[in-house]
């Protein structure tokens, strides 16, 4: 009885059920999802895949933000994979730290390399990334997510000369490669922590690497 009385004031001020409004909202959400299913990146063999429902009720602005983040992470992961493979037998000449008498050649492969970087070196890396994020690699207003071109270079000219179909294909390829790279660099890092061998591909192929 007490619970019923406590709920009564809230019920008195409640609006009547509006089935038409609910149906309109559901239809709008469904139409928005359908529009995302035709976006670049929703392609065979997986198609539109959103198991966490991140864009279930999202508008175009929210979708574009998530797509920009996905592209950025994919680009970083692609650089990470290339860097991870390149450093297996390659080191910069000279010293990493004169104070600690540490040469670049003294750095091990993989994640273990971070343990050799002095604090000031780590700070330099963070500052360099921050400068690129804030001042260099910036989203072009009014363009598609991930367009950070600044103009005035040969790459921009080559891009502008491509047809819309070719540009769409290139963007889809970048998305797929970025997604694969994110899984790839994570797999290599996990493999290294499990076996202390940073290069699973080299191990499977029997290829040697100099630094470890």
Swiss-Prot record:
One MF annotation (Gene Ontology) recorded for this entry: chlorophyll binding
Recorded topology in the membrane: Multi-pass membrane protein
Main subcellular location of this protein, as a coarse class: plastid
A GO CC term assigned to this protein in UniProt: chloroplast thylakoid membrane
Pfam families, A to Z: Chloroa_b-bind (PF00504)
Segments crossing the lipid bilayer: 76-96, 117-137, 178-198
Keywords annotated in UniProt: Chlorophyll, Chloroplast, Chromophore, Light-harvesting polypeptide, Membrane, Photosynthesis, Photosystem II, Plastid, Thylakoid, Transit peptide, Transmembrane, Transmembrane helix
Biological process terms in GO annotation: photosynthesis, light harvesting
Regulation: induction: Levels are increased twofold when transferred from high intensity to low intensity blue or white light.
Transit peptide: 1-34
Keyword 4Fe-4S included in the entry's annotation: no
Gene3D superfamilies: Chlorophyll a/b binding protein domain
Subcellular location(s) per record: Plastid, Chloroplast thylakoid membrane
Highest taxon above the source species: Eukaryota
Claim: Ribonucleoprotein is one of the keywords in the record: no
Functional summary from the UniProt entry: The light-harvesting complex (LHC) functions as a light receptor, it captures and delivers excitation energy to photosystems with which it is closely associated. Energy is transferred from the carotenoid and chlorophyll C (or B) to chlorophyll A and the photosynthetic reaction centers where it is used to synthesize ATP and reducing power.
Subunit structure: The LHC complex of chromophytic algae is composed of fucoxanthin, chlorophyll A and C bound non-covalently by fucoxanthin chlorophyll proteins (FCPs). The ratio of pigments in this LHC is; fucoxanthin: chlorophyll C: chlorophyll A; (0.6-1): (0.1-0.3): (1).
Family affiliation: Belongs to the fucoxanthin chlorophyll protein family.
Protein name: Fucoxanthin-chlorophyll a-c binding protein E, chloroplastic
Species for this entry: Macrocystis pyrifera (Giant kelp)
Gene from which this protein is expressed: FCPE
């Amino acid at each position: 009885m007490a619970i019923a009385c406590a709920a009564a004031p809230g019920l008195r001020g409640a609006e009547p059920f509006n089935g038409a409004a609910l149906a309109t909202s559901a239809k709008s959400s469904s139409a928005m999802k359908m529009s995302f299913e035709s976006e670049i990146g929703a392609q065979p063999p997986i198609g539109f895949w959103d198991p966490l429902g991140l864009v279930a009720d999202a508008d175009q602005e929210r979708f574009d933000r998530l797509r920009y983040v996905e592209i950025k992470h994919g680009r970083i992961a692609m650089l990470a994979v290339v860097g991870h493979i390149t450093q297996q037998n390659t080191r910069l000449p000279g010293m990493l730290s004169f104070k600690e008498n540490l040469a670049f050649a003294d750095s091990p492969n993989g994640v273990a390399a971070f343990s050799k970087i002095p604090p000031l070196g780590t700070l330099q890396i963070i500052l360099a990334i921050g400068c690129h994020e804030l001042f260099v690699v910036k989203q072009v207003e009014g363009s598609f997510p991930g367009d950070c071109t600044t103009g005035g270079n040969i790459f921009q000219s080559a891009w502008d000369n491509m047809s819309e179909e070719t540009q769409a294909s290139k963007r889809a390829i970048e998305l797929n490669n970025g997604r694969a790279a994110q899984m790839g660099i994570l797999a290599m890092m996990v493999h290294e922590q499990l076996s202390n061998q940073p290069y699973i591909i080299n191990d499977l192929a029997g290829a040697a690497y100099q630094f470890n």
